[in-house]
């Protein structure tokens, strides 16, 4: 288990409990269960206190936790007959974006998501979830296919932002993001999005311009990272805590503002402490959102999606 900075007191207690049990495994005559159980209860109480009222900055840390389920985990856990499709038919295949045909609850769908990777090798391969233009063009290709065959689209958003490298800019990063956002608004099929970790700027919006948007309880969704905002406004990246407060980037704030439609509850201690439980909860949320949309006419779906985004800013601003 990887512990976040604010979880250090918890790591000490859980570490002691594990040490006691390790000693008992090596010496069967030792009876440490009573003491270890007391430490477990103490750890659970502390965990509840730590997660009872997380600050926006701490939610950012939880959203970035390396042990959270990623796009690949959700695809493997919720979808069957997944057939990945590669490439943008123009330049290359971007591994930061996964996507393909699959079945959800035995119904055919198109699933698209950003994948960060789970270790050093896969994080480099996936570019830490930061898509290049060819990734967004791959997403456009998949959405066009979904529109053609009348298949619902499910997107899983988890990115610090689109890749800002020189090559990406030369190949039209801004245009690719804009085209992907435009395509989201055009397709006449149900489109639902779930922010499963970080929803960073236009890199997230390009996949999240949906009829229905859900966020995991401790995920974040923002126009810029707190560090980036602090660097611009205060010329000091260390002011990220103040920036996180000002950005209103939590699921709770965004639900009040009408930016998202649903908050998916996470297990105590975050998705990283209950991966299977979190995957199942996301699956139930997707099922409920699709039920609201499947069977609607293409014209209704396009109008609903456009109105949703045109109306943003008219709710919750006085809060």
UniProtKB/Swiss-Prot annotation:
Its function, per the record, reads: Component of the acetyl coenzyme A carboxylase (ACC) complex. First, biotin carboxylase catalyzes the carboxylation of biotin on its carrier protein (BCCP) and then the CO(2) group is transferred by the carboxyltransferase to acetyl-CoA to form malonyl-CoA.
Task: Quote the Gene3D superfamilies the UniProt record gives.
Answer: 2-enoyl-CoA Hydratase, Chain A, domain 1
Lineage, highest ranks first: Bacteria, Pseudomonadati, Pseudomonadota, Alphaproteobacteria, Rhodobacterales
Q: Which Pfam family would be a valid example here?
A: ACCA
* GO MF annotations in UniProt: acetyl-CoA carboxylase activity; ATP binding; carboxyl- or carbamoyltransferase activity
Q: Which reaction does it catalyse?
A: N(6)-carboxybiotinyl-L-lysyl-[protein] + acetyl-CoA = N(6)-biotinyl-L-lysyl-[protein] + malonyl-CoA
Q: Which family is it part of?
A: Belongs to the AccA family.
For the biological process aspect of GO, one term held by this record is: fatty acid biosynthetic process
Query: In the UniProt record, does the keyword Cytoplasm occur?
Result: yes
Q: Which UniProt keywords apply?
A: ATP-binding, Cytoplasm, Fatty acid biosynthesis, Fatty acid metabolism, Lipid biosynthesis, Lipid metabolism, Nucleotide-binding, Transferase
Complex and partners: Acetyl-CoA carboxylase is a heterohexamer composed of biotin carboxyl carrier protein (AccB), biotin carboxylase (AccC) and two subunits each of ACCase subunit alpha (AccA) and ACCase subunit beta (AccD).
Name its cellular compartments: Cytoplasm
What is the name listed in the Swiss-Prot or TrEMBL entry for this protein?
Acetyl-coenzyme A carboxylase carboxyl transferase subunit alpha
Leading EC class: transferase
| Pathway(s) of this molecule | Lipid metabolism; malonyl-CoA biosynthesis; malonyl-CoA from acetyl-CoA: step 1/1
Q: Which gene encodes it?
A: accA
Entry-linked PROSITE patterns: COA_CT_CTER (PS50989)
**Which residue intervals define the domain CoA carboxyltransferase C-terminal in the entry?**
38-292
GO cellular component terms, alphabetically, are:
acetyl-CoA carboxylase complex
Quote the EC number: 2.1.3.15
Q: What is its main location?
A: cytoplasm
């Amino acid at each position: 288990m990887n512990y976040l900075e604010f979880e250090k007191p918890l790591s000490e207690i859980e570490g002691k409990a594990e040490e006691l049990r390790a000693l008992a495994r090596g010496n069967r005559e030792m009876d440490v269960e009573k003491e270890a159980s007391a430490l477990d209860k103490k750890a659970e109480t502390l965990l509840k206190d730590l997660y009872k009222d997380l600050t926006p900055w701490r939610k950012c840390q939880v959203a970035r936790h390396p042990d959270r389920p990623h796009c690949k985990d959700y695809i493997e856990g919720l979808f069957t007959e997944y057939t990945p499709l590669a490439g943008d038919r123009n330049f290359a295949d971007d591994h930061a974006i996964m996507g393909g045909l699959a079945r959800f609850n035995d119904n055919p769908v198109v699933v698209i998501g950003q994948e960060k990777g789970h270790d050093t090798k896969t994080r480099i391969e996936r570019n830490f979830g930061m898509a290049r233009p060819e990734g967004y063009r791959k997403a456009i290709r998949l959405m066009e296919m979904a529109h053609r065959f009348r298949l619902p689209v499910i997107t899983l958003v988890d990115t610090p932002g689109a890749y800002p490298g020189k090559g990406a800019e030369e190949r039209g990063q801004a245009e690719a993001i804009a085209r992907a956002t435009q395509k989201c608004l055009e397709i006449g099929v149900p489109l639902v999005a779930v922010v499963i970790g970080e929803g960073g700027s236009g890199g997230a919006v390009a996949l999240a311009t949906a009829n229905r948007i859900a966020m995991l309880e401790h995920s974040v969704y923002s126009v810029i990272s707190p560090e980036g905002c602090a660097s611009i406004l205060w010329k000091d990246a260390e002011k990220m805590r103040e920036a996180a407060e000002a950005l209103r980037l939590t699921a709770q704030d965004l639900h009040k503002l009408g930016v998202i439609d649903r908050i998916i509850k996470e297990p105590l201690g975050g998705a990283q402490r209950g991966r299977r439980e979190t995957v199942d909860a996301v699956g139930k949320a997707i099922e409920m959102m699709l039920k609201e949309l499947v069977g609607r006419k293409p014209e209704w779906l396009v109008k609903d999606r456009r109105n949703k985004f045109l109306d943003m800013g008219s709710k919750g601003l006085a809060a």
